[in-house]
Regions:
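Core subunits and conserved enzymes of cellular information-processing
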Residues: 1-199
């Protein structure tokens, strides 16, 4: 059972990386964290995936004063998403024409929601950024929604100022990722009967 959950976790994280790579190739806007990662990548010359990994480690260090404990899923989230994103960015060609760019964005968004549901449903630990929201909730009593909004507004603004791409894809992500995860989650959650909070 543990092995199957771990496989589901890895598949979910790879799907997330694939979805993120497609949204990068669409050039129509990324989710807030990847806008930040893209901006930092432009600034430093490091790959998007490597910046994602370093960012994940930095965010996880913020767990220490919040007394959050990482799980196996937390570590896997940091490493697998970053590596898979870099791999898929090598394999996926640039979109030629607006029709293909929109297709990349839509498919990327759906795969990101599917991947998120898969790794959450495996119940093996939150990602570093989700864990930060939970820690802020426990430490200061802020709602997870408010915590997420504040943190993502900061990273979005910072990433955009550094040259990250924000646009219609960013808005679509903000509006649709929650409903997509909620739609896919039961299929991945039920086999293990893992109780996870709603997105």
């Amino acid at each position: 059972m543990w092995g199957l959950r771990f496989i589901q976790l890895l598949l979910g994280l790879c799907l997330f990386g694939l979805g993120a790579a497609l949204m990068v190739r669409a050039h129509l806007g990324l989710d807030p964290w990847n806008v930040f990662h893209q901006g930092m990548s432009s600034l430093t010359g490091l790959s998007l995936g490597m910046i994602s990994i370093l960012s994940g480690v930095a965010v996880m260090l913020l767990w220490i004063p919040l007394r959050q404990k990482p799980g196996l899923g937390t570590i896997a989230n940091i490493v697998v998403i970053g590596l898979s994103m870099d791999l898929f960015l090598v394999l996926i060609a640039e979109a030629d024409g607006m029709g293909l760019r929109i297709t990349y964005m839509v498919v990327g968004l759906v795969l990101t929601g599917l991947g998120t549901a898969a790794y959450i449903g495996a119940g093996m630990g939150t990602g570093p950024r989700d864990g930060l929201m939970i820690g802020l909730n426990r430490k200061f009593g802020w709602s997870i929604r408010v915590s997420r909004m504040l943190v993502e507004l900061v990273v979005l603004a910072g990433g955009w100022l550094l040259g990250g791409v924000a646009g219609v894809g960013t808005v679509a992500f903000a509006l649709l990722i929650g409903p997509l995860v909620q739609f896919f989650l039961p299929a991945f959650q039920e086999p293990w009967r893992v109780k996870t909070p709603p997105v």
